[in-house]
Curated annotation (Swiss-Prot):
Entries under Pfam families matching the protein: MarC
Keyword Amino-acid biosynthesis carried by entry: no
GO cellular component: plasma membrane
Localization annotation: Cell membrane
Upper taxonomic lineage: Archaea, Methanobacteriati, Methanobacteriota, Methanomada group, Methanococci
Organism expressing this protein natively: Methanocaldococcus jannaschii (strain ATCC 43067 / DSM 2661 / JAL-1 / JCM 10045 / NBRC 100440)
Name of the molecule in the record: UPF0056 membrane protein MJ0972
Length: 228
């Protein structure tokens, strides 16, 4: 009886460690693709004409909107796949390539083109004109973050694991919101070279993640073709 209890305890420990590792993986992947550090110069340029209180409110609304977008994809992404007949392995390959492109831009300390268009204009009289576009979409919850969310959900098999993905989204958005709220402070304390160095490090990590995602997708597609 004691032996059974001991085995049961060890099984639970291993199970919860796997869940913790999945949460950390999800949080880190989302944090890197959101890239709040790299967004600091953009957010500063978009919001500096507004008073400080208004800037904080803009960032808060953008974070909430971005969180809702990612949660919608997390909860209903599989239905979208089913409707369009998209397999998860095909999405892994396509999404991995997109993440690799974003990571490549980050390695060169460039703003990913999927996140920003140089010809975007601002209407300073309307806060919502920058809260939803371009701040919430595509800067914060851009194609990279949406792709990462969908891939994380594809790895889940239980309600608990789906809850872990939701928690990863909320955590990554919370930390990103805190960082972006400190944009003025960080701009004053850290020069652009320090920000670029951090972006390059995050880009290197994202390259590794994207290559692994592409490889997993290719193996899955090959196996499905072999079975047929």
């Amino acid at each position: 009886m004691v032996g059974y209890s001991g085995e049961h305890f060890i099984f639970n420990v291993v199970k919860y460690m796997d869940i913790l590792n999945f949460y950390i993986y999800g949080f880190v992947s989302l944090f890197i693709t959101i890239d709040p550090i790299g967004l600091i110069p953009i957010v500063h340029s978009l919001t500096y004409p507004y008073p400080k209180e208004q800037r904080i409110r803009i960032i808060k609304k953008a974070i909430i909107s971005s969180t809702v977008v990612l949660l919608l994809f997390a909860l209903f992404g599989n239905y979208i796949f089913g409707y369009f007949g998209i397999t998860i392995d095909a999405f892994r390959v396509a999404g991995g390539i997109l993440l690799f492109k974003i990571a490549w831009d980050m390695l060169h300390a460039e703003i990913p083109k999927t996140k920003h268009k140089p010809d975007e204009r601002l209407d300073l009289e309307d806060i919502d004109s920058i809260v939803y576009v371009p701040l919430a979409i595509p800067l914060i919850s851009g194609p990279g973050a949406i792709t990462t969310t969908m891939i994380l959900i594809s790895k889940t098999q239980s309600i608990l694991e789906k809850g872990v993905v939701v928690l990863s989204i909320l955590s990554a958005m919370l930390v990103s919101g805190i960082i972006l709220s400190l944009t003025d402070f960080i701009i004053r304390r850290v020069n652009i070279y320090g920000i670029n160095a951090f972006v390059r490090i995050m880009g290197l990590l994202l390259v590794a993640i994207s290559v692994q995602i592409i490889f997993t997708g290719i193996v899955g597609l090959y196996n499905s073709i072999s079975v047929q």
